[in-house]
């Protein structure tokens, strides 16, 4: 009788663990907290009319620099990185409370630039 109880308890514990493992979210956690590059309403400047700007994450990676490429560098670096940023395809300037701002109309991932507001 004791072995039946222990087998039943083991089976119950196993089924509970399988339930927990199955209910765990099956998502890619590498970019957790950073949504894709999209057009979003800027709440700071959207007072009398909506102002949209590009926000979100794009591609980035780092890898060891190939030896052939390292030989051509004036200051050799062991790690090479490449990245794209969330930038506007089309913009037009508008004025909000006496400040000129860029209202974005379309976004994509492209070469990273430092943008002015």
Curated annotation (Swiss-Prot):
Subcellular location: Secreted
Cystine bridges: 34-57, 37-86, 54-107, 58-109, 85-112
InterPro entries hit by this protein: Cystine-knot_cytokine, Glyco_hormone
Residues with glycosylation annotation: 78, 103
Swiss-Prot/TrEMBL GO biological process terms: G protein-coupled receptor signaling pathway; positive regulation of steroid biosynthetic process; regulation of signaling receptor activity; thyroid hormone generation
The keyword Glycoprotein appears for this protein: yes
Gene Ontology MF terms in the entry: follicle-stimulating hormone activity
First and last residue of the signal peptide: 1-23
GO CC term, one of those recorded: follicle-stimulating hormone complex
SMART domains for the chain: GHA
Keywords of the record: Disulfide bond, Glycoprotein, Hormone, Secreted, Signal
Domain of life: Eukaryota
Protein's UniProt keywords contain Secreted: yes
Family: Belongs to the glycoprotein hormones subunit alpha family.
UniProt function note: Shared alpha chain of heterodimeric glycoprotein hormones. These hormones bind specific receptors on target cells that in turn activate downstream signaling pathways. Involved in gametogenesis and steroidogenesis.
Quaternary structure annotation from Swiss-Prot or TrEMBL: Heterodimer. Glycoprotein hormones are heterodimers composed of a common alpha chain described here and a unique beta chain which confers their biological specificity to the different hormones.
Protein name: Glycoprotein hormones alpha chain
Annotated source species: Acanthopagrus latus
């Amino acid at each position: 009788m004791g072995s039946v109880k222990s087998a039943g308890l083991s089976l119950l514990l196993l089924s509970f663990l399988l339930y927990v493992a199955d209910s765990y979210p099956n998502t890619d956690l590498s970019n957790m907290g950073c949504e894709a590059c999209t057009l979003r309403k800027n709440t700071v400047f959207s007072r009398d009319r909506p102002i949209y700007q590009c926000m979100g994450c794009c591609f980035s990676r780092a890898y060891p620099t190939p030896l052939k490429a390292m030989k051509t560098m004036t200051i050799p670096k062991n790690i090479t990185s490449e990245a794209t940023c969330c930038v506007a395809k089309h913009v037009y300037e508008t004025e909000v409370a006496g400040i000129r701002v860029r209202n974005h109309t379309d976004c994509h991932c492209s070469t990273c630039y430092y943008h002015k507001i």
